UniProtKB/Swiss-Prot annotation:
Gene3D superfamilies: Aldolase class I
GO molecular function, one term: 1-(5-phosphoribosyl)-5-[(5-phosphoribosylamino)methylideneamino]imidazole-4-carboxamide isomerase activity
Keywords: Amino-acid biosynthesis, Cytoplasm, Histidine biosynthesis, Isomerase
GO process terms (BP): L-histidine biosynthetic process; L-tryptophan biosynthetic process
Subcellular locations according to the entry: Cytoplasm
Pfam families recorded: His_biosynth
The protein's name: 1-(5-phosphoribosyl)-5-[(5-phosphoribosylamino)methylideneamino] imidazole-4-carboxamide isomerase
Originating species: Desulforamulus reducens (strain ATCC BAA-1160 / DSM 100696 / MI-1) (Desulfotomaculum reducens)
GO terms for cellular component: cytoplasm
Amino acid sequence: MILFPAIDLKEGQCVRLVEGRMDSATVYSNDPGSMARLWQDQGAQYIHVVDLDGAFAGQPRNRQSIAQIVQGVQVPVQVGGGIRDLETIEDLLSLGVDRVILGSAAILKPELVAEACRKYGQRILLGIDAKDGQVAIQGWGETVKRTALDLALEMKQLGIERAVFTDIRRDGKLSGPNLAATGELARNSGLRVIASGGVASLEDIRQLKKLEQDGVEGAILGKALYTNAVKLPEALVIARGEESVC
């Protein structure tokens, strides 16, 4: 299982939010590039970046910080937040971003998802952000009458093979991931799923590891790392199935 340290960008700073609320931001670093290197040095195989300003604005706002992150590490980087046209996708990939995540665009512009998948294949991921079972878009500020599974199946038909699934109610709260919903989505959609939201302990990672057989291939770690609730090297041992930690 792959663990993705998260770097959430707000005005060029690394922050964490609670339930996606911008007024809840806690700043952890003013240097996103060095934060990415820190996680790489601790063993990260992949970095997950979210442009929070972009998610709310509908277009990327932290391009320079994203470039610093990509240029500062040797591991691949995936980026989401405000990516709603092909030009933005191409720009991010030209910076060296490995994969881009389309969230609101899946609802607002499904034709973009289809075109991007045709052009870039597995470099395009679906971002499913759910609140109380309903998909949320536009920086999580609006819910639509669509379930996570409905959206996953629709996007699978357009070429999507992998999705990041975030339970908004758990994001930034260290309350544990929504194991049931994550496992069900992977099983019933046939997509490879990366879990996001609520991971708070090594035990949470153990439980997510058990869902690998259902198609859960990774987990995003945010606040747990920044508050030292979870130490990345120990978490990676569990993710690799080399359990002798704790």
